[in-house]
Amino acid sequence: MTSKRTAADAIAGTLKAYGAEFAFGIPGNDVLELVRACEEAGIRFVLSKSEPSAAFMADAVYQVTGKPSVLIPALGPGLANAISGIAGALQERSAGIVLGGEMATKQMGIYTHQGFD
């Protein structure tokens, strides 16, 4: 059986190449493949209790280590809830990467749970 490299694998490999060691968030179905790829690439995923705290933790990693960290919130409200932490990191000029999920195009307009337009 041949395994195929996914977009998530490519993203995780690039994040690792740029020095990311941690990713934070509350994953939903839309980002599970990315979380798996990050862990396989050696990026430790830290499950948080809220999206804002995940964003603040990601910012703290950069502030303490100088290495970029990753925020992986679920789609819609998950990403919206993280905005206060993202804004704080922006004000501090932190090197953070936010990779929010999105529903599959074929589900848009049909399956709208937590979808943002």
For each predicted feature, which ranges?
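N-terminal alpha/beta PP-like core and its mobile active-site loop of ThDP/TPP-dependent enzymes
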Residues: 1-117
